[in-house]
């Protein structure tokens, strides 16, 4: 199972002010062509900087587990927090729009927790840019502006492993990314609930790939990407 897991953080003395879930990207995560869904998350930090992140359902489960492990004396208090319920709501969502909204609610819950937790190394590390985010980011984007465009299917773009000329964005998949390929991450039995199981993506695997990329366009401010093959 691929993920955006990494250790350590360079975001000391900073915290997340807000986050929005823009959509879902389905990426190839192994040489066998296995695909996994990643939520595309826009985060705004205390210094007004903006990061675009990609996290899987398994990453969300690990975040909640690591919070409990990092504060063993507060396990009972963290158990009362609506984190587990949020994960179950995401896993049980029957459509993509509901799933995106539930992911956003869970992340808002995390960053709204007392500073002891929301500004802990565990949370800051989760929201730090990962090697996967480095590959998918667009360095030419400097500002956010409203963008109302139709959903874009990108599964075929990912399979092409190269440049996209569909006038939406340029994507390059680098198979040398650490923690990718066929490497499996260690997880104990309690974490299996949060793994991205087959039933989690069954509605996307049936039929003709209804939407490999779906965005929440009702009120989000998205980044319009421009494609330039010469970049």
From Swiss-Prot:
GO terms for molecular function: phosphatidylinositol binding. InterPro entries: PX_dom, PX_dom_sf, PXDC1. It comes from the Eukaryota. Disulfide bonds: none annotated. Residues 1-134 form the PX domain. Pfam families: PX. Transmembrane segments: none annotated. Gene3D superfamilies: Phox-like domain. This is PX domain-containing protein 1. It comes from Rattus norvegicus.
């Amino acid at each position: 199972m691929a993920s955006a897991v990494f250790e350590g953080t360079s975001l000391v003395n900073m915290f997340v002010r807000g986050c929005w879930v823009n959509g879902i990207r389905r990426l190839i995560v192994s040489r066998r062509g296995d695909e996994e869904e990643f939520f595309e998350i826009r985060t705004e930090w205390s210094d007004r900087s903006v990061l675009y992140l990609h996290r899987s359902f398994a990453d969300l489960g690990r975040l909640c587990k690591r919070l409990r492990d990092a504060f063993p004396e507060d396990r009972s208090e963290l158990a009362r927090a609506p984190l587990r319920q949020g994960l179950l709501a995401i896993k049980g969502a029957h459509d993509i729009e509901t799933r995106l909204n539930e992911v956003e609610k869970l992340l808002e819950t995390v960053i709204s927790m007392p500073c002891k937790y929301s500004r802990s190394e565990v949370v800051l590390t989760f929201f730090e840019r990962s090697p996967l985010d480095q590959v998918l980011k667009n360095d030419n984007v400097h500002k956010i502006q409203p963008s109302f465009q139709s959903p874009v299917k990108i599964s075929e773009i990912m399979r092409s492993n190269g440049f996209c000329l569909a006038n939406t964005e340029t994507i390059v998949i680098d198979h040398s990314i650490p923690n990718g390929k066929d490497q499996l991450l260690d997880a104990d039995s309690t974490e299996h609930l949060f793994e991205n199981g087959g039933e989690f993506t069954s509605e996307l695997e049936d039929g003709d790939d209804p939407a490999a990329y779906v965005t929440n366009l009702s009120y989000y401010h998205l980044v319009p990407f421009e494609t330039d093959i010469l970049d």
